[in-house]
Each structure stands twice: as structure tokens, then as C-alpha cells.
Curated annotation (Swiss-Prot):
Lineage: Bacteria, Pseudomonadati, Pseudomonadota, Gammaproteobacteria, Moraxellales
Residue window of motif JAMM motif: 191-204
Claim: Zinc is one of the keywords in the record: yes
Organism: Acinetobacter baylyi (strain ATCC 33305 / BD413 / ADP1)
Protein name in the entry: UPF0758 protein ACIAD3126
GO molecular function: metal ion binding; metallopeptidase activity
Keyword Ion transport (UniProt): no
Highest rank taxon of the organism: Bacteria
Length: 271
């Protein structure tokens, strides 16, 4: 390492560990946010704005960075308990209250946005954001249906089937009855993998193809099937897997909407 690099690293270390009020103005998170927008800040810098102050050992930014590294991300920081956060010097009841208030404000903002009347979900990104909001917090596998009108506005959303950590028993007939009751022109189905990867199983592929065929028979369009997991998402439509016959069963009879056609994907139905 050259002497100039050593000087740079020492300078950076001193800057990061002293109080933010002594930093050059262009390096302070709050000033950078006002000048360049919040998207220009790192997770640690955004978190530092809410922490406001650090500890005797660390600036607010360095404290925020240590917290994110310890918990493995920004979301786990906000999910941590007061007892867990208080292990960090400089974090007490006041800062914990600030973080919980920010988390609750964010939750209320999203809740208001996603539950407005006739929410327009006319892009796969909007649909995916909505489904992540609804399903990411679930601790067991859940199968859900999003019903849309002809202009891709939300009619209703329901978590139809609940299962164990990694399995869920799904009725195609029950799913179609619900979509017809909502007068849906389009539907998007989704399920989560609470502790697994966002990758489809053979049963997922089989279910998707059968439901795609069944929807065609009742003139409802299945737009996509999403798998939601903490490590990412999977779209059947993006992989051209909605109608492809890469499944165990490729032909189904016209659905009996009065029967109970269960598909193995093993659980209790939601009320």
C-alpha cells in the first residue's frame, strides 16, 4: 500500500468515527439527502439520520453500519427487540422508539397505498411489490389470489390456503370459484417460501399449468404465478412456464366448481 493510500484510509477512519457535525458538509448524510435526494444515500447513512447521534466510539453512520452488519440487513434492524439493540453502545429507549416509529409510519404508508380503491396494478413490478408486501412477513407457506378487472385494477386479494413451513394443499376449484365471485377478468396467483429459495418445485409447475388450463375454460386469464422468498422472487410468466407442458399432468377436465379438487403443494384452508 502506498503512503498516500495509508493517509487516505487514516483520514477516512477518523472522519467516520468522529461526530458527524465535524464532517465536511458535503459528506454529512442529511445535507447530501437534501442536495442529491434520499436515493443517493446508503442504508447506513439513511439509518444514521434517524439515529441522529452515535456513541463515544462511533459516529451515527458507523454505528448504523455496525448494526446492519450484525443483523444481516436493514430490515432485521427494524425487527430487532430493544434488548437486542441495546447491546450497541449509544442505543437506548429513545433511539429504539425512533426506529419503531419509523417502521410503523412506513407500514401505514404502504397499507394506505396498497389498499386504496381501484388500485392500478398494470405492470409486473407493481404487482410484485404488492405481493411482496402481503406475503413476505408470513411464517408459513401461503397461497394467495389477486383478482383484477379488465383494466388491471385490483378487485380483491385473499390468502386462500395456509400450510406448514414448506407445503400447502390447494384446491383449483375453490380458487376458481373465488375468482368468479369477484368477477375477475384476470388473476395473479402467488405463494411464499418462508425459509426456502424462490425456485419452483415439480408440484408448483404442475399446479400452475392445471390452473392455467382451468382459467381458460371459464374465460379468466392467469397473468402470472409468483413465488415470494426472502432471497428473491420467481415469475412463471417471465420464464414462459404458465402454459408450457413441463409438468406431470398436462390435461384436465372442465373444472367442477361445486367439487373439491385438491392439489398437493398440506394444510388447513383459511376461513
Amino acid at each position: 500500500m502506498s503512503f498516500s493510500n495509508q493517509n487516505y484510509n487514516v483520514h477516512t477512519f477518523i472522519i467516520m468515527n468522529q461526530s458527524i457535525k465535524f464532517w465536511p458538509e458535503q459528506e454529512r448524510p442529511r445535507e447530501r439527502l437534501l442536495h442529491s435526494g434520499p436515493e443517493s444515500l446508503s442504508d447506513a447513512e439513511l439509518l444514521a439520520i434517524f439515529l441522529r447521534t452515535g456513541s463515544k466510539q462511533h459516529s451515527a453512520v458507523e454505528l448504523a453500519r455496525l448494526m446492519i452488519q450484525h443483523f444481516g440487513g436493514l430490515n432485521p434492524v427494524f425487527d430487532a427487540s430493544l434488548q437486542e439493540l441495546s447491546h450497541f453502545h449509544g442505543i437506548g429507549t429513545t433511539k429504539y422508539a425512533h426506529l419503531m416509529a419509523v417502521k410503523e409510519l412506513g407500514r401505514r404508508y404502504l397499507n394506505h397505498y396498497f389498499h386504496q380503491d381501484a388500485l392500478n396494478l398494470n405492470s409486473s413490478r407493481l404487482v410484485l411489490d404488492y405481493l411482496r408486501y402481503e406475503l413476505l412477513g408470513e411464517k408459513q407457506e401461503v397461497f394467495a389470489v389477486l383478482c383484477l378487472d379488465s383494466e388491471l385494477r385490483k378487485l380483491n386479494f385473499k390468502k386462500l390456503f395456509y400450510g406448514s413451513l414448506n407445503a400447502c394443499n390447494i384446491s383449483i376449484n375453490h380458487t376458481l370459484r373465488y375468482a368468479l365471485q369477484q368477477h375477475a377478468c384476470h388473476i395473479v396467483i402467488a405463494h411464499n417460501h418462508p425459509f426456502g429459495k424462490a425456485e419452483p418445485s415439480a408440484a408448483d409447475l404442475d399446479l400452475t399449468h392445471q390452473l392455467y388450463q382451468a382459467c381458460q375454460l371459464v374465460e379468466i386469464k392467469l397473468l402470472d404465478h409468483f413465488i415470494i422468498a426472502k432471497d428473491g422472487t420467481f415469475s412463471f410468466a417471465e420464464r414462459a412456464l404458465l402454459s408450457q407442458k413441463k409438468c406431470m399432468h398436462t390435461d384436465i377436465d372442465k373444472p367442477d366448481l361445486t367439487g373439491e379438487d385438491h392439489h398437493k403443494k398440506s394444510c388447513d384452508r383459511s376461513p
